[in-house]
């Protein structure tokens, strides 16, 4: 892995793979000895509270369009959060670029601006550009082939929000069988269901549920593409609903700790947790608006009312 970033994507060079490096029989005598870290990480080491990220669904594309020579756009038929998985065979060193978007232009080409990272909209300066950032922070993954028969790959340390996948650099012409959409989210246990005699209500519920799961990874986010921030106001708005449908206990314990970790010196709470500098119409000192600050106390009340857990209050 040459780069991984939840906004800019992952870059993977399969030529650099070390075969069997994780097996006890591997000869690591040429490896250098580890060195102690001069300044260790701060804070207290604790167990991970949130559920692991799992594959929820594998979505096959419904059509492929060659928008320009060597540029192919795959339509998954629905919006989702996750990554693309490719199956490819080609020469060593072939570089495949995958970009993601929620819409296409009238000519069928990918509209990457529908899912660029919101806090990176402007052109990067020279120093940032040299670090590998593109002029526009679109969602992009890169895979470099090792050239050893069929290769199957998907990013491991990023996720995107998208419906359309653009592929360039493919050796030859891909088919619908070469690309899959891997839908991801936190592995929340289902605790409730909804159905009614009204199909419109049923469809609305399915859309709401699908949207919610697209926004639960390490935080309960506002969107899986542009920002991916854990806004307190968004949590206050929907947490009660989804406590009926999923076991949100550990996920919300983690969210409370996130807000506690970023509490401001004057006592206020940030608009997002983890804190990223956003303080729209806050009270100063980096605090967020009152409705967003309420997430800290509101979630503690939710844990008590829905799960009988008063430990975090105590």
Residue ranges and their predicted role:
Residues 226-236, 247, 287-298:
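Aromatic- and histidine-enriched alpha-helix N-cap/loop-to-helix transition segments
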Residues 170, 237-248, 295-312:
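Well-ordered alpha-helical scaffold segments within catalytic/enzyme domains
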Residues 202-205, 209, 249-260, 297, ...:
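Hydrophobic core segments within long, regular secondary-structure runs in both alpha-
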Residues 275-308:
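Charged, long alpha-helical assembly modules
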Residues 1-226, 233-234, 250-253, 266-284, ...:
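Extracellular/oxidizing-compartment recognition motifs
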